[in-house]
Amino acid sequence: MKEFIISEAKVETAVLVGLITQMQDERKTNEYLDELAFLAETAGAEVVKRFTQKLPTANSVTYVGKGKLEEIRQYIRTEEEEEREVGMVIFDDELSAKQIRNIEAELKVKILDRTSLILDIFAMRAQTANAKTQVELAQYKYMLPRLQRLWTHLERQGGSGSGSGKGGSVGLRGPGETQLEMDRRIILNRMSLLKERLAEIDKQKATQRKNRGRMIRVALVGYTNVGKSTIMNLLSKSEVFAENKLFATLDTTVRKVIIDNLPFLLSDTVGFIRKLPTDLVDSFKSTLDEVREADLLVHVVDISHPGFEEQIEVVNKTLADIGGGGKPMILIFNKIDAYTYVEKAPDDLTPRTKENLTLEELMKTWMAKMEDNCLFISARERINIDELKDVVYQRVKELHVQKYPYNDFLYQTYEEEE
């Protein structure tokens, strides 16, 4: 099996499909599809159409009902007649091997689900050997129960011509591109090798963490694309890659930061996202160890996002799942410069909702109860950054006195790094 060769994605057109269910209303489904569209664009695809259907639960055979599947098929056929080829259909939930096989048989195009799309972006973003190894293992975990479908799919894609070089397309990056006769034993052997490699990396990183000295560890956590890397750059005065795309950060970056006379370690971690299976998150153990071993979590939230409260829940649940819950935390509401609200007309007598609240009114809701553990900033416009430094400094100092009460360097003179 060859190592990853990260490929440049050609522009492919994509159709999105989501469900409106008892547990997921239309507003939430549209919000999820907005995120799925952003994921598709990050992977290099152009979204041209969306389909939704109301069902109690997903159809176990074809995800959507037969009538909706036929509607999607007719749309693809019409586009082909107009010489506008649809490259793929992306579903907003993880599909079973049976569902993928049945849907492909009907639509005759590439079928992706949310998980495979996210893994494809991981493959694009991975830069270090550690990240590439983690991504490869995660992709094999996803691939293993879908092997039979993968063979058929890759043969349709053109087998020998779809190698892992420059021609890789959305959903086909990483392993599985060149060996169509891959079987379960080969994959399991490869996974064992990758796990051994990651175990060795874990040991190396654990040793590195032990050698960092007696300093408080602070980890930036949050949903993907909320501005963690920009905040990292402001606090550490270093250049960590920051981009307005999902999963711009995949490798954990650790920097020594000094505020006033107090040095501490600050790490920027991979962003979390909804509907990502825990067993795939587990592939990123060495990366997430920075979160597990942190003394303080700085939870960054994009307050301009309409679903920011649900994103907070996703992050908190993921933290609990990986063993990072229950730690001291500061909640940072970023992007206040981008916050918008819907102003009601004077004669509108309907009850006000969250969408009608100004930022000042929103700040007086449940967030007000958090007092010093909550801060509102704009990292891009550098609004309230001094206040952010003050809050982080106070919390780090409190933790340092508790953890290292006899550490002399608290009384030494340090200067903030230029």
Predicted feature locations:
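C-terminal-of-GTPase-core extension/linker across diverse P-loop GTPases
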Residues: 1-16, 37, 148-226, 232, ...
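Conserved catalytic network of the ASCE P-loop NTPase/AAA+ motor domain
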Residues: 8-9, 77-84, 256-260, 265, ...
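Switch/connector loops and helix/strand junctions flanking conserved nucleotide-binding motifs
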Residues: 24-27, 58-62, 97-102, 119-122, ...
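Switch II of P-loop NTPase G domains
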Residues: 2-5, 31-34, 57-74, 251, ...
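Conserved Switch II/interswitch segment of TRAFAC-class P-loop GTPases
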Residues: 22-23, 59, 94-97, 292-313, ...
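Short alpha-helix plus adjacent loop in nuclease-associated cores
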Residues: 117-138
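N-terminal accessory targeting/assembly segments
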Residues: 1-119
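Switch I (effector-binding) loop of TRAFAC-class P-loop GTPase G-domains
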Residues: 2, 210-213, 234-264, 273-283, ...
